[in-house]
Amino acid sequence: MATDQHSNKSNVSAARKPLSPSPTASAAGLIKINGSPIELVEPEILRFKAFEPILLLGKSRFAGVDMRIRVKGGGHTSQIYAIRQSIAKALVAFYQKYVDEQSKKEIKDILVRYDRTLLVADPRRCEPKKFGGRGARARFQKSYR
């Protein structure tokens, strides 16, 4: 059984997943996040954000794929966004490697049409602090007298 490693970073939260074809072709796609099923993702309000790639593409496309995602760092929201992006990117990579190019392109088009951030990472990072002030851009107050 072959596995592929994919990783994704959203601001400070990082999601890594080994992706493997299911041992049985008829098995439903197993998606676990930190050892628990995706249906139990907390907080409940953000659960459907993690489900977006599955709801967009349908369960049938995930049937032959097992995903075990480890996510750490950041807050609840950035972790959920890292999870959803890693699921989408892994499925596209799986279809490119194990299925055909046409199916991969079809999946990619559906995901990009819905939300481009499912496949493209947000490049913004925290700017480092500089001297002469309390933050990256803020300066200490200047007195003339």
UniProtKB/Swiss-Prot annotation:
Location(s) in or outside the cell: Cytoplasm
Q: Where is this region: Disordered?
A: 1-24
| PROSITE patterns linked | RIBOSOMAL_S9
The UniProt entry, under InterPro entries, shows:
Ribosomal_Su5_D2-typ_SF, Ribosomal_uS9, Ribosomal_uS9_CS, Ribsml_uS5_D2-typ_fold_subgr
Q: Biased-composition ranges for Polar residues?
A: 1-13
Record Pfam families = Ribosomal_S9 (PF00380)
Alphabetically, the GO molecular function entries are:
RNA binding; structural constituent of ribosome
Keyword list, A-Z: Cytoplasm, Ribonucleoprotein, Ribosomal protein
A Gene Ontology biological process term: translation
The terms describing its cellular component in GO are: cytosolic small ribosomal subunit
- Would you identify the family this protein belongs to, as annotated? Belongs to the universal ribosomal protein uS9 family.
Give the protein's recorded name. Small ribosomal subunit protein uS9
Naturally occurring in which organism (per UniProt): Lupinus polyphyllus (Large-leaved lupine)
* Organism classification: Eukaryota, Viridiplantae, Streptophyta, Embryophyta, Tracheophyta
Gene symbol here is RPS16
